[in-house]
Amino acid sequence: MKPIEWLTGCRLGAPRLGVDTDERTIPHEVGWIGGPGAGAVHLNKGCYRGQETVARVHNLGRPPRMLVLLHLDESVQRPSTGDAVLAGGRTVGRLGTVVEHVELGPVALALLKRGLPGDTALVTGPEAEVAAVIDVDSLPPADDVGAGRRAVERLRGGIR
């Protein structure tokens, strides 16, 4: 992939396998299923390793992590792919693609714990010296509830 494609993919939130994903990534976390234009995983076809996990998350909703765009502090050296992302001294995710955008400056894709507020103060880099801000437009919708989750809530008396 050429650098311009990395830049475009990063800005659009299109993850690269093995760079923006890790061995624990499930399709829901990176928009490969259930998102606009998604088509990497089909729920009704075939048998594959991890299918039960994919079906459970699809029906109950709420994948454990989310792919977001981070705006990075440009006054220090740019962090690297794979660097930890920290909030309050605790690891909350990892960096994927890191690029220099013409208009936005340094940006990166990151897999972060789901539910992390958009205004959370984040740091990254080898020495945790690079400030990072979540692009709130890249956050997944908060009302993303699967059919199975609605059924569970109905049984518990929460949804009518």
Each predicted region: which residue ranges?
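Generic recognition of cysteine residues
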Residues: 10, 47-50
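Glycine-rich, small/acidic residue-mixed loop/short-helix segments
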Residues: 24, 30-41, 49-51, 55-160
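Non-catalytic protein-protein interaction scaffold segments in large eukaryotic complex-forming proteins
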Residues: 20-22
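Acidic, low-complexity central loop/insert segments
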Residues: 1-15
